[in-house]
């Protein structure tokens, strides 16, 4: 009798993706983040669905409905904080996943990488719109400031902003459409993730050495299923600890004040995972220039394959590039810190320096260093 796992049309797809998938024998824990992101996405969709059952997207009742969820709904507080901190977990995994791709040269799989960049943009858009929904002070002013950036686009800017707002300011129409988009986008993200996997399975996974691993493959199950379960348990433990011990650690206290268009908070800032991009935006005095830099800070990932000048794929055996990679990581931490600081001396100058270093490292210093390494290796 034929094995149903290998003959059934649906099971065949599952089998070739998660069971009999040939995987390199030497992939490290840095390859766990794909599955962790999948778990994050499923958790966010499920908790979000239950929140949407009790949430009302109306300016008069949005804040109250979130309070109602936390106070009156069975385990509503748990669902709400799992959703809010689940987003933070999602971005931690995303940043580590992208960092892994940069370090080990996974960006050489062009289609997979470009879909990944699209995914990053989609998840960032989803998270931004989700932050607006509780309709606290930071929700309202964050939405006002970030959507207002589009007015920097020449000629159509002002019309575009008013079209997105559905009026002359962030109001009921804005909140309603943001809720609609926030609900639908995760399903688009799930579809994109499917395409991401489809392209990945065309080539197979990269590995830490960056060398071809076709001669030494092992089945995904049981080796990497067990490894992924361990990673998932560690992540779930971290998320549970955050949710149960300090659920507001990563949030802004201002968001516990209902939105008030007549009162601007002293420091308008987004969630921690956007602070690096926000710092780059603020470090440019010109509005349009700032918006371009903001978009480019993420879009620059798409051109990284074109900037790969090294003869080796991975950074595993390239100590100079390794040093620069960790300088880039330190620079991103610096930008994140600056994004949360007020716009005053010395933070402005530090932010400008960190922004210049960020773009210089990626566009100039790292490709040049790779060429020097080629020379040193006489390749």
UniProtKB/Swiss-Prot annotation:
Alphabetical list of InterPro entries matching this protein: Cyt_b/b6_C (IPR005798), Cyt_b/b6_C_sf (IPR036150), Cyt_b/b6_N (IPR005797), Cytb/b6-like_sf (IPR027387), Cytochrome_b (IPR030689), Cytochrome_b_C_euk/bac (IPR048260), Cytochrome_b_N_euk/bac (IPR048259), Di-haem_cyt_TM (IPR016174)
Subunit field text: The cytochrome bc1 complex contains 11 subunits: 3 respiratory subunits (MT-CYB, CYC1 and UQCRFS1), 2 core proteins (UQCRC1 and UQCRC2) and 6 low-molecular weight proteins (UQCRH/QCR6, UQCRB/QCR7, UQCRQ/QCR8, UQCR10/QCR9, UQCR11/QCR10 and a cleavage product of UQCRFS1). This cytochrome bc1 complex then forms a dimer.
Family statement drawn from the similarity comment of this UniProt entry: Belongs to the cytochrome b family.
Domain of life: Eukaryota
SUPFAM superfamilies per the UniProt record, alphabetical: a domain/subunit of cytochrome bc1 complex (Ubiquinol-cytochrome c reductase), Transmembrane di-heme cytochromes
Positions contributing to a ubiquinone binding: 201
Residues that, per the record, bind heme b b562: 83, 182
Function per UniProt: Component of the ubiquinol-cytochrome c reductase complex (complex III or cytochrome b-c1 complex) that is part of the mitochondrial respiratory chain. The b-c1 complex mediates electron transfer from ubiquinol to cytochrome c. Contributes to the generation of a proton gradient across the mitochondrial membrane that is then used for ATP synthesis.
Compartments it resides in: Mitochondrion inner membrane
Binding residues for heme b b566: 97, 196
Bilayer-spanning residue ranges: 33-53, 77-98, 113-133, 178-198, 226-246, 288-308, 320-340, 347-367
UniProt keywords, alphabetically: Electron transport, Heme, Iron, Membrane, Metal-binding, Mitochondrion, Mitochondrion inner membrane, Respiratory chain, Transmembrane, Transmembrane helix, Transport, Ubiquinone
The protein's name: Cytochrome b
Predominant cellular place of this UniProt entry's protein: mitochondrion
Cofactor: heme b
Note: Heme 1 (or BL or b562) is low-potential and absorbs at about 562 nm, and heme 2 (or BH or b566) is high-potential and absorbs at about 566 nm.
Pfam families, sorted: Cytochrom_B_C, Cytochrome_B
Cofactor binding summary note: Binds 2 heme b groups non-covalently.
Membrane topology according to the record: Multi-pass membrane protein
């Amino acid at each position: 009798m034929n094995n149903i796992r290998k003959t059934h049309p649906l099971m065949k797809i599952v089998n070739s993706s998660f069971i009999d998938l040939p995987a390199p024998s030497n992939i490290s824990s840095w390859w766990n983040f794909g599955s962790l992101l999948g778990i994050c996405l499923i958790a966010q969709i499920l908790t979000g669905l239950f929140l949407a059952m009790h949430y009302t997207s109306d300016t008069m009742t949005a804040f109250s409905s979130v309070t109602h969820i936390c106070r009156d709904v069975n385990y509503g507080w748990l669902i709400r904080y799992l959703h809010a901190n689940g987003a933070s977990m999602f971005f931690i995994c995303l940043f580590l996943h992208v960092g892994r791709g940069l370090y080990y040269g996974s960006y050489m799989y062009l289609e997979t990488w470009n879909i990944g960049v699209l995914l990053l943009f989609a998840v960032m858009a989803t998270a931004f719109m989700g932050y607006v929904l509780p309709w606290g002070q930071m929700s309202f002013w964050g939405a006002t400031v970030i959507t207002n950036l589009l007015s920097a686009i020449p000629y159509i800017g002002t019309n575009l902003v008013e079209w997105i707002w559905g009026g002359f300011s962030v109001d009921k129409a804005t909140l309603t459409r943001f809720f609609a988009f926030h609900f639908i986008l995760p399903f688009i993200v799930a579809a994109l993730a499917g395409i991401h996997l489809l392209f990945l399975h065309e080539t197979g996974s990269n590995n830490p050495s960056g060398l071809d691993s076709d001669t030494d493959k092992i089945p995904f199950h049981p080796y990497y299923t067990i490894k992924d379960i361990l990673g998932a348990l560690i992540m779930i433990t971290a998320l549970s600890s955050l949710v149960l011990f300090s659920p507001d650690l990563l949030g802004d206290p201002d968001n516990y004040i209902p939105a008030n268009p007549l009162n601007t908070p002293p420091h308008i800032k987004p969630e921690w995972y956007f602070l690096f991009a926000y710092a780059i935006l603020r470090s440019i005095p010109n509005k349009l220039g700032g918006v371009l830099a903001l978009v480019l800070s993420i879009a620059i990932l798409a051109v990284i394959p074109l900037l790969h000048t090294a003869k080796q794929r991975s950074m595993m055996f390239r100590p100079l590039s390794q040093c620069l990679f960790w300088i880039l990581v330190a620079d991103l931490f610096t930008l994140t810190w600056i994004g949360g600081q007020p716009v005053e001396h010395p933070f402005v100058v530090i932010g400008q320096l960190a922004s210049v270093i960020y773009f210089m490292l990626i566009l100039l210093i790292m490709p040049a260093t790779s060429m020097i390494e080629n020379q040193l290796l006489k390749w």
